[in-house]
A protein has these predicted regions:
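Glycine-rich, Arg-bearing micro-motifs that act as flexible, cationic patches
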Residues: 109-136, 150-152
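General small-molecule cofactor/ligand-binding pocket signal
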Residues: 30-32, 88-92, 142-144
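A short acidic, glycine-rich active-site loop
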Residues: 53-74, 119
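Small/aliphatic-rich secondary-structure junction motif
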Residues: 1-58, 136, 146, 163-177
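Active-site phosphate/pyrophosphate- and oxyanion-stabilizing loops and adjacent acidic/basic residues
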Residues: 17, 77, 131
Length: 177
């Protein structure tokens, strides 16, 4: 059984714990972290626009890329240590939700933490990326609460029922037709 675990800062410990609890016999565990290319790319562009391309050693985009890579490596190392068993560490760069779906191809299970409003039950507990991943994953998804699950009383009230359509006297199901 191949399990892919999407790791995000702040919620990754719960995802790792979910693998230990719900997939203890997994034959392969892939710890996945995805970095968005946006911030370093913006810094590269701003630097090149202001000072030209001749001073690469001073480009703040390079420093941001290095910081991001080191942070991702530390997160993956901490997750592997918490898992306490053999695993593969995978760092990808791109549109987060699409990279997660691509990494889950061929997996038997994808572990995902809720990334939206985690204070109440309901559809808003998934953010944009989480919703995309849940809707497009090519395998079963284990969707977890990274903290204590909110009480059932936090479910939003149902929308009002639409009024019944008017009955037409000549309709075939009308009792006087």
């Amino acid at each position: 059984m191949r399990v892919v675990v999407w790791l995000v800062e702040g919620t990754w410990p719960a995802c790792v714990d979910a693998v230990r609890t719900h997939a203890p016999r997994a034959t392969e565990v892939v710890l996945l972290h995805v970095s968005e290319p946006g911030v370093p790319g913006l810094a590269h562009g701003a630097f090149a626009g202001l000072l030209g391309r001749g001073h690469a050693e001073r480009d703040p985009g390079n420093r941001l890329e290095d910081l991001g890579a080191r942070s991702a490596a530390r997160l993956l190392d901490a997750a592997a240590e918490r898992l306490g068993r053999a695993c593969t560490r995978q760092e990808r760069t791109g549109r987060t939700e699409r990279e997660v779906v691509a990494a889950a191809e061929g997996a038997d299970l994808l572990v995902v933490a809720r990334d939206g409003d985690r204070a109440r039950l309901g559809p808003h507990s998934l953010g944009r990326a989480g919703r995309f991943v849940v809707d497009h994953a090519p395998c079963p998804v284990l969707l977890i609460w990274p903290e204590a699950t909110p009480a059932v009383t936090t479910i939003p009230p149902p929308p009002p029922h639409p009024p019944d359509p008017p009955h037409h006297p000549h309709h075939p199901h009308h009792p006087h037709s």
